[in-house]
Structure formats: C-alpha cells, structure tokens
Amino acid sequence: MASYTVKLITPDGENSIECSDDTYILDAAEEAGLDLPYSCRAGACSTCAGKITAGSVDQSDQSFLDDDQIEAGYVLTCVAYPTSDCTIETHKEEDLY
C-alpha cells in the first residue's frame, strides 16, 4: 500500500495530509481534522468538488463529472484515491456551473 502527500488548498489556507492509495481523500481529510464540504459520499453529486493542480487521482467510482470537467482537472474528493503526491483546491462546486 502506497501513501501520498495530498496538499489541500481551502478558503482557510493550506493543509497537507497523508493519504494511502486505498483511502478516499475526503475520508483522509476528515481523519486529519479538516472540515471539507460533502453530501452524498458516493460520487453522484458535486458538493465535494475540487480542482487538482498537481499530481493525479483515481476517481473511477464517480458518476457525476463529465469528460470535459475531468479533463479540466475537477475531482470529487469523496471518491478520489491519490495515485501520486497531489495538490487539490477544495470548495470548487460553484466553478462547475
């Protein structure tokens, strides 16, 4: 099991957390004491949306984002596993619309 450093850029500042490659980023953030937005926890809405600015994730469990949004770097943190060290700007739901 690999572990990666995930930098989360929130409206309140930056936080770096450790996240294993079999843990969703939202879950790891909550375990680290961070309060990120979420609703369905199933990849079927956009409440937890973020934008990845460096690195990569596996969000194959998501069913909400279209191909253009994924190509633009949007990620649903509730169903995203890190596949490298990465940086994600959180609280991006409004940017999707």
UniProtKB/Swiss-Prot annotation:
Which cofactors does this gene product need?
Answer: [2Fe-2S] cluster
GO BP terms in the entry: electron transport chain
Co-factor remark = Binds 1 [2Fe-2S] cluster.
What's the superkingdom here? Answer: Bacteria
Locate the transmembrane regions by residue number.
none
| UniProt entry keywords in alphabetical sequence | 2Fe-2S, Electron transport, Iron, Iron-sulfur, Metal-binding, Transport
All copies of domain 2Fe-2S ferredoxin-type, residue ranges: 4-94
Q: Which InterPro entries match?
A: 2Fe-2S_ferredoxin-like_sf, 2Fe-2S_ferredoxin-type, 2Fe2S_fd_BS, Beta-grasp_dom_sf, Fd_pln
Q: One GO MF term, please?
A: electron transfer activity
Q: Does the keyword Iron apply?
A: yes
* SUPFAM superfamilies named among the record's database cross-references: 2Fe-2S ferredoxin-like (SSF54292)
- Positions that bind [2Fe-2S] cluster: C40, C45, C48, C78
Cross-referenced PANTHER family? FERREDOXIN, FERREDOXIN-2, CHLOROPLASTIC
Function text? Ferredoxins are iron-sulfur proteins that transfer electrons in a wide variety of metabolic reactions.
Family the UniProt entry places it in: Belongs to the 2Fe2S plant-type ferredoxin family.
List the protein's name: Ferredoxin
Q: What organism is this sequence from?
A: Synechocystis sp. (strain PCC 6714) (Aphanocapsa sp. (strain PCC 6714))
Q: What is the lineage of its organism?
A: Bacteria, Bacillati, Cyanobacteriota, Cyanophyceae, Synechococcales
